[in-house]
């Protein structure tokens, strides 16, 4: 019974409404490890899946979870009932590499502020 208390059953809700899990994780499991699980278990038939842990953001109880936090740190004081499954929402944000940044921004394209003055009347 003590083992169940020190674990949290988590399912990961994807953007299309499908789920990965649920699966039991010990309280000492880090958010980074949860993200590794999402990357490893991402359905192969789904497009735009995460390539690395850096592409994944996990949201629980309205908060974006930090990689160094543990499952125990992320427990909500309200709503974690014995045997209840915790749903974490998965957001995929692919990291833009320096090469891609340069490709998107044409060389010599500097932002220029332009002011235009229009006069509609006898005095200007």
From Swiss-Prot:
<keyword id="KW-1003">Cell membrane</keyword>
<dbReference type="GO" id="GO:0005886">
    <property type="term" value="C:plasma membrane"/>
</dbReference>
<feature type="lipid moiety-binding region" description="S-palmitoyl cysteine">
    <location>
        <position position="117"/>
    </location>
</feature>
<keyword id="KW-0564">Palmitate</keyword>
<keyword id="KW-0449">Lipoprotein</keyword>
<dbReference type="InterPro" id="IPR029071">
    <property type="entry name" value="Ubiquitin-like_domsf"/>
</dbReference>
<feature type="lipid moiety-binding region" description="S-palmitoyl cysteine">
    <location>
        <position position="115"/>
    </location>
</feature>
<protein>
    <recommendedName>
        <fullName>Membrane-anchored ubiquitin-fold protein 2</fullName>
    </recommendedName>
</protein>
<keyword id="KW-0472">Membrane</keyword>
<dbReference type="Pfam" id="PF13881">
    <property type="entry name" value="Rad60-SLD_2"/>
</dbReference>
<dbReference type="InterPro" id="IPR039540">
    <property type="entry name" value="UBL3-like_ubiquitin_dom"/>
</dbReference>
<feature type="domain" description="Ubiquitin-like">
    <location>
        <begin position="8"/>
        <end position="74"/>
    </location>
</feature>
<comment type="function">
    <text>May serve as docking site to facilitate the association of other proteins to the plasma membrane.</text>
</comment>
<dbReference type="InterPro" id="IPR017000">
    <property type="entry name" value="MUB"/>
</dbReference>
<feature type="lipid moiety-binding region" description="S-palmitoyl cysteine">
    <location>
        <position position="119"/>
    </location>
</feature>
<dbReference type="InterPro" id="IPR040015">
    <property type="entry name" value="UBL3-like"/>
</dbReference>
<feature type="lipid moiety-binding region" description="S-palmitoyl cysteine">
    <location>
        <position position="124"/>
    </location>
</feature>
């Amino acid at each position: 019974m003590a083992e169940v208390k020190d674990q949290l059953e988590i399912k990961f809700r994807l953007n299309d409404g499908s789920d990965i899990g649920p699966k039991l994780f010990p309280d000492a499991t880090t958010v980074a490890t949860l993200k590794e699980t999402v990357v490893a278990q991402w359905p192969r038939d789904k497009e735009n899946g995460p390539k690395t842990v850096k592409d994944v953001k996990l949201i629980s109880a309205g908060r974006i979870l930090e990689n160094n936090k543990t499952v125990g740190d992320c427990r909500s004081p309200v709503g974690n009932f014995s045997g209840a499954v915790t749903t974490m929402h998965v957001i995929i944000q692919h990291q833009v590499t320096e090469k891609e940044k340069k490709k998107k921004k044409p060389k010599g394209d500097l932002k220029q502020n332009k002011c235009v003055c229009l006069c509609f009347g006898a005095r200007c």
